[in-house]
Amino acid sequence: MLRRESIGDKYLNKSEQGFSLLELMAVILIIAIAATMTMPLLQHQIAAREIDTIARRFIAHAHFARQQAIHLGQPFLLMPTVRGDWSSGWVVKSGCIGKSANAACIEKRWFIQGNIQPIHFKSNGKQFIDPNTGKKGILFNASGAAKTAQGGFVANRLVLGHERVPDLERQMILGSGGRWRICDPATDAKRCH
């Protein structure tokens, strides 16, 4: 836009500082190209954070079940809410569990985790299946040890995946010492085995 200024009896045309429409469109095009190039990486990072959040939540609930079993001196069970499908959610409960459950016991549910979509548990991994009953779950006895319903020790893994990024996974591993770890097989395959 031109502005007129007068110096004495003469008029000078001066332009104001600013950007033309063409320059503005070029900048918007550059921003759009950069956003298009970085979007897949951003979606991958969001999916990785979602998987990590669910993994940490599951481990926190397992730690809670173990600590309550020790504190209250009774068994606690962490199990899927729907017929052996961890992806539908899980429940932490106490009472009426194990071989020594009596008729007067009252079951108490401490935590219930709902559906975790778009995260899902992959079928590879043992998924804490009791070899005798075929049921999934982790039973913590009064001393805090993870056992099966028949008394066998549990050292196992669960594998988490994401619906939108199929090649992304995290493994939650319960070691023989009762310690949990989360590993990414894409970056530390040696630690995952």
Kindly label every feature range from the protein language model.
Residues M25-L41:
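Alpha-helical hydrophobic helix detector
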